[in-house]
Design a protein with these regions (language model features):
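N-terminal secretory/targeting leader peptides
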Residues: 2-122, 130-131, 137-338
């Protein structure tokens, strides 16, 4: 099963319809356990395509005892609201970006440290290994259960209107839109950029009117927001990677008999592996499509960017915030940062 750009873009209409009423993708007759799975991506996003397949498989293998209903597109509230519902038990399952989860579990932001990962093999080695194990243990302290396999949210790329980014010097003085996050702001300040927080809904206009000259996001966001219309260059900086943790309310999870838990975990983790592959295919097709629309792509070596962050004190700042133990685990996974 391939997730194509066309399917992703078609989500616009589906998302609008989804806000009107809950979408129950799995139906059943008096399931013993009916659990809600909330997320913030459209129905046709690889997360929901694979979650739907997993929910079907779980229902079939449990003989209808566990019925997982999917609520896409932030239908049950904002990320902050839904995280609160997950903690209270109002929602049983939720996929959430590690960088957003870090508001509750600071260690979850470890995977988003600037230029920590050189490529996807490095990501999966760390997140399926010691680093992922450490972060899941910290998540458990918040009374949440994280599935073993994290889902892919993607590497973030940098788009600009005037020139490609080829070295840290190209970021100097650049007015760049970033999310409201200390990690993003401190990284671009370390590059001597001028980061500005702009809501996603206002991003296109801000770029069009030159309030900001650049932005950074995964390619899926560049495509969905049609940023190629106001941005000429896309530099594949891969400066941050982020994933979706598949989270469960601990009480709800432990309410399931052990055999049902094992079945659910098996299919959810398998779905994560398939979704990772889907995202790789999607990103490749998005680059081809955006190139066809006139966007100019370039790749770059990242060593100079790491060196700049090191000398600017960015890594030292975040090592102090995360603590020596967490930082040592990160560096064992990705190599010495600073």
């Amino acid at each position: 099963m391939n997730i194509t750009r066309r399917k992703l873009i078609q989500s616009t209409a589906i998302t609008a319809a989804a806000t009107a009423a809950p979408i129950k993708l799995v139906y059943g007759q008096s399931a013993e356990f009916t659990y809600k799975f909330a997320n913030n991506v459209p129905l046709t996003h690889p997360v929901n395509v694979r979650a739907k397949a997993a929910a079907d498989a779980i229902r079939n293998e449990t003989n209808g005892r566990l019925d997982i209903q999917i609520f896409p597109s932030s239908q049950l509230g904002s990320d902050t609201d839904t995280l609160s519902q997950l903690r209270s038990g109002g929602v049983e399952f939720f996929t959430l970006s590690g960088l957003i989860l870090s508001t509750l579990v600071p260690a979850a932001a470890l995977s988003g440290v600037g230029f920590a990962f050189s490529d996807y093999p490095a990501v999966w080695k760390a997140m399926d290994g010691e680093l992922g194990t450490y972060i899941r243990a910290q998540i458990a302290k918040a009374n949440l259960v994280a599935m073993d396999k994290i889902w892919d949210n993607g590497f973030r790329q940098t788009t600009t209107s005037s020139k490609p980014i080829t070295s840290p010097a190209d970021l100097r003085g650049l007015k760049i839109r970033v999310p409201v996050s200390p990690m993003w702001a401190s990284m671009f300040k370390a590059f001597d950029s001028a980061p500005a927080s702009v809501n996603a809904s206002e991003m296109y206009t801000a770029l069009q009117t030159k309030v900001v000259d650049a932005q950074e996001n995964p390619l899926s966001v560049v495509s969905l927001f049609k940023l190629n219309e106001v941005q000429k260059y896309c530099s594949q900086t891969n400066h941050m990677w982020d994933g979706f943790w598949f989270l469960a309310n601990r009480r709800a999870w432990e309410r399931l008999p052990v055999p049902l838990r094992e079945i659910a975990a098996k299919h959810l983790n398998a779905a994560a592996m398939s979704q990772r592959s889907d995202m790789a295919t999607l990103n490749s097709s998005l680059q081809q499509d955006l190139t066809g629309k006139g966007m100019v792509f370039n790749t770059l070596a990242t060593d100079a960017f790491r060196d700049k962050l090191r000398t600017a004190g960015y890594y030292a700042e975040w090592k102090a915030k995360f603590g020596a133990e967490a930082w040592a685990i990160l560096e064992r996974s990705v190599g010495t940062l600073g």
